[in-house]
Design a protein with these regions (language model features):
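Binuclear metal-ion centers of metallo-dependent hydrolases, dominated by the metallo-beta-lactamase
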Residues: 2-9, 95-164, 223-224, 255-323
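Short, solvent-exposed loop/turn and secondary-structure capping segments
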Residues: 84-85, 111-113, 180
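Active-site metal-binding motif and surrounding structural segment of the metallo-beta-lactamase
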Residues: 37-44, 51-102, 226-242, 253-257
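Core dinuclear metal-dependent hydrolase active-site scaffold
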Residues: 1-68, 138-234, 304-323
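Hydrophobic/aromatic beta-strand patches that form the interior of the parallel beta-sheet core
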Residues: 18, 73, 100, 168-170, ...
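Active-site environment of divalent metal-dependent phosphoester hydrolases
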Residues: 25, 51-52, 77-83, 106-109, ...
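Adenylate-forming
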Residues: 249-251
């Protein structure tokens, strides 16, 4: 059954996106649907990272009095996207939550992936939220150059038509996972974790397209569904702006993009040449921080007023900076 949220007017609708990174590695994105009074009526989180006792994702959810996450996506089991996911499940997921996981990530020894310490605990937490009537665990894949509608809901103003909101998965690709499973069975070759990455597109009213690209790389990008990228409003640049993910530039608009990246310091990411290419076509380009460890985190906040002023306000915290 389609979920519906009543709002007084489209002009009161706000979309807040928080892109969170840390001084050495780590990525999490919190997306809040709210009214003009900052009342949150839908929450989406992609990935998590924590550094010691610091979990900025949890802090943000607490700040906005979020009682439960509607949709949690664990894009792939790399450490810099995974630490603290189990904390979010334990504190914010209930019998209404959906948890997206790449198809084939089931915590078994035969999954053709080398799990990090703690990954299987995350998977156990996810399965623990399954019940007879509500399957929280949603394994995600789609065919090459295809897309999968993950969820949808409508905003219902008093005096206007409903606004349709859709969330699509554009990866990982089922063909590659099947091939990787065969190679593991026959040759004991592990799959590269980034090739499991879930890439999401949030479509608001078929007018605004927000892309959460996790760590997809060129092998996936070369076979990804292109249409939504051609109309992109916002893109979290894949794989910390590496050259190995730069083919996405061929699919994106030539100007007026809003783009951002997290970092992975030990790998020398973001790549300066890749950032220069994004800079040319972006009205806004931000990073969660490439400077020295003045602060141990960086947060980029985008406050979208899509139907009132048709504007975006940007606020930077910690190490976050303009490129």
């Amino acid at each position: 059954m389609m979920r519906k949220f009543n709002i007084e007017d489209y002009k009161n609708f706000r979309l807040r996106i928080f892109v969170i990174g840390y001084s050495d590695q780590g990525e999490s994105i919190v997306t809040l649907f709210m009214d003009e009074h900052e009342h949150v009526f839908y929450t989406m989180v992609v990935d998590c990272y924590a550094k010691g006792d610091m979990n900025k994702t949890k802090e943000l959810l607490d700040r906005f009095h979020v009682e439960h996450i509607d949709l949690l996506c664990w894009s792939h089991p790399d450490k810099d996207h995974s630490v603290g996911v189990d904390t979010l499940i334990e504190n914010f997921c209930n019998d209404k939550s959906y948890i997206l996981v790449p198809y084939g990530i089931e915590g078994r020894d035969g999954d053709c992936v080398k799990y990090n310490e703690g990954d299987k605990q995350v998977i156990q937490s996810i399965f623990a939220h399954n019940s007879r009537l509500h399957k929280a665990f949603k394994p995600i894949s789609c065919i090459e150059e295809g897309h999968l509608q993950v969820t949808s809901f409508d905003l219902c103003p008093l005096l206007d038509d409903e606004l349709h909101i859709r969330l699509y998965a554009l990866s990982p690709h089922a063909e590659y996972i099947a091939e990787a499973r065969y190679n593991y069975k026959e040759k004991q070759q592990y799959i590269h974790k980034n090739n499991f990455s879930i890439s999401l597109c949030l479509d608001i009213g078929n007018s605004y397209f927000f892309h959460y690209c996790s760590d997809i790389e060129n092998r996936t990008i070369n076979h990804i569904y292109p249409d939504f990228f051609e109309k992109a409003t916002f893109v979290k640049i894949p794989h910390h702006s590496s050259k190995g993910s730069a083919n996405l530039l061929d699919l994106l608009p030539k100007d007026k993009l809003i783009s951002c990246t997290t970092i992975y310091k030990s790998q020398g990411l973001p790549d300066e040449d890749v950032l220069k290419q994004y800079k040319v076509r972006s009205s806004y380009l931000h990073t969660t921080g490439t400077s020295d460890d003045v602060n141990s985190y960086g947060i980029i906040e985008y406050d979208f007023d899509l139907f009132g002023q048709h504007s975006v306000d940007v606020r930077l915290y910690g190490n976050a900076e303009v490129v």
